[in-house]
Amino acid sequence: MRERFRRARVARLATVGEDGKPHLVPVCFELAGDRVVSVVDAKPKRTGELRRLANIRAHPSVTLLVDEYDDDWTRLWWVRADGLARVVETGADRDDAVAALTAKYPQYEAQPPGGPVVEVTVHGWVGWAYLEG
């Protein structure tokens, strides 16, 4: 299950705002043990004040979902990671996360991410695959 999660190229990060409304965004990520990291990178954003960061600061419980769809339904699967997130602005934890993300996504070599890191400590894994029942 974790290996499928780790190999995925994009996850959906679900957070909850102070108003109780869910917020879902696609993110690049890396998995290291029970920690999932993502970074606010240089891709264009509508605003510098990202809702996901405000939501995490207000309510740190998050979910990350990766999945595979195929018209051959025997290839379908999904993995969900539930955990507690924190926003890491500076320091060794941020630097280590960016290095791990750069190893997975070479695009970051040309455009080094300058934003904060979202670090999720996973406390629950759930998944399903057609061939595994």
What are these regions (language model features)?
Residues M1-V10, T15-E18, S38-A58, V118, ...:
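Conserved functional hotspots at enzyme active or ligand-binding sites that engage polyanionic ligands
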Residues R2-E3, C28, A54, D70, ...:
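Short secondary-structure boundary/capping segments
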Residues R6, A32, A58-P60, P113:
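Residue-level preference for short coil/turn positions at secondary-structure junctions
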Residues A8-K45, L64-D67, W77:
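Short beta-strand segments
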Residues R9-V10, S61, P106, W125:
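Generic structural signal for secondary-structure transition and capping sites
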Residues A32, I56-A58, V88-A92:
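A short, structured loop/turn motif at beta-sheet edges
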Residues T47, D72-G133:
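Charged, gly/pro-rich active-site loop segments
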Residues A58-D67, V79-L84:
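Active-site-adjacent structural patch at catalytic or cofactor/ligand-binding sites
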